[in-house]
């Protein structure tokens, strides 16, 4: 069996700190995966996908290839986390909303009763 693939999927990832961050966290096999759009379907069909973070421009493009999409990610309309389960299903989540909420709470910001505009949807 081929080693599982772990990494950040996107285009033009030279600015990313993901590899050194994951290495520091004990994940030495994490890598940057830069693909052209036409290569995305074949890549996502690989059975040895372990786990991926997904960034632009593929946060929406990967969704049709996912077998299971978290309801919150479905509502947001984009995903940023993929995992191939042991049954072969490709599952997807969006951690942007939870991360944003956590950051706001840590900063002491409450949106309760407030009108808020968020530009973009993480895609």
For each feature predicted by the language model, list its residue ranges.
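Glycine-rich Rossmann-fold phosphate-binding loop(s) that bind the pyrophosphate
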Residues: 11, 121-122
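Short acidic/polar capping segments at secondary-structure boundaries
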Residues: 96, 122-123
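Conserved beta-strand elements of the Class I
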Residues: 7, 117-119
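Short helix-loop-beta connector
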Residues: 109-115
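Phosphate/diphosphate ligand-binding glycine-rich loop within oxidoreductases
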Residues: 2-109
């Amino acid at each position: 069996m081929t080693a599982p693939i772990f990494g950040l999927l996107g285009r033009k990832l030279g600015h990313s700190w993901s590899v050194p961050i994951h290495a520091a966290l004990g994940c030495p096999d994490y890598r940057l995966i830069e693909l052209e759009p036409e290569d995305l379907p074949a890549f996502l069909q690989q059975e040895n996908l372990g786990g991926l973070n997904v960034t632009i421009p593929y946060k929406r493009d990967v969704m049709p290839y996912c077998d299971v999409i978290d309801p919150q990610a479905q509502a947001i309309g984009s995903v940023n986390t993929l995992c191939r389960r042991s049954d072969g299903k490709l599952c997807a989540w969006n951690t942007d909303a939870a991360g944003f909420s956590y950051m706001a709470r840590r900063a002491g910001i409450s949106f309760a009763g407030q009108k808020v505009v968020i530009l973009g949807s993480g895609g």
